[in-house]
Amino acid sequence: MDYIGIDIGSTASKVVVKGDHDIHFVLPTGWSSKETCQTIKDRLLEDSVDVLSDDSKVVATGYGRVAVDFADHVITEITCHARGGREMAGDECAIIDVGGQDTKIILVSGGMVQDFQMNDKCSAGTGKFLEIMANRLGVTLQELFDMADKGTVLPISSLCTVFAESEVINYIGEGQKREDIAAGVVDSVANKVAQLAMKKNLPEKVILTGGLSNSTYFTKILSQKLGQTVSPTEHGRLCGCTWCRTP
């Protein structure tokens, strides 16, 4: 039996297979979630995993979960992250999930979702913002973090991605160091995530999921902003599909 978790995010889609096979991969979601689902189905079949077989159980989550028309079950990201948080940190914890489109703060109490908070529609406090700014600076996301770790923060005050990008362009025009601009960019996102999280009474155990959990620098900065330890998760980008699959 294969247990398959599929997380169709706004920018990336993630797949984890456990059971008879041990597979995981990430691919761009692209403009069509349905086409992405077909790509996932075809790729799994290349690895001898037939999602339509009685020997496969598929659970879908994420922004485009309804497009996974071959899923046996569909659950929200809130539910699957709460399940995973309980497994990792116990019945009392908070999960900060920084995705491409949104950021979620999920409080777990007694092993159940107690409350959650999401950012507004602007992408300024999300991974997409960092991706846009990294492209503007001509570096990868990992290189952005590496540069930020060596820089001094230049303030980026705008709450809007478009206006924030204008601030970055102005800094570039002034000849400011890329390391300092990168530090300002990461600091800006950490500020917005922390402000969102501090709207809730966070428990002692806080874990970070999503692609940014792979960055020790971002985890460190966010911990400083919150005044408490934020623990990264291994393979943070895969948490949604790992925690949604059954059993």
Residue ranges: model-predicted function:
Residues 64-115, 194, 198, 242-246:
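Conserved phosphate-binding catalytic cores of ATP/NTP-utilizing and phosphoryl-transfer enzymes
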Residues 3-7, 57-59, 93-97:
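Short glycine-aspartate micro-motif
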Residues 21-29, 49-79, 114:
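Short beta-strand-loop/turn "lid" adjacent to the catalytic site in phosphate-handling enzymes
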Residues 164-199:
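Adenine-nucleotide phosphate-binding core of ATP-dependent small-molecule kinases
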Residues 127-131, 231-247:
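Glycine-rich phosphate-binding/hydrolytic loop that grips phosphoryl groups
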Residues 3-39, 43, 113-123:
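Short glycine-rich, Thr/Ser-proximal phosphate-binding strand/loop in the N-terminal lobe
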Residues 63-64, 202-225, 233-240:
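Glycine-rich phosphate-binding loops at beta-strand->alpha-helix junctions
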Residues 110-156, 160, 246:
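Glycine-rich phosphate-binding loop plus the immediately following alpha-helix
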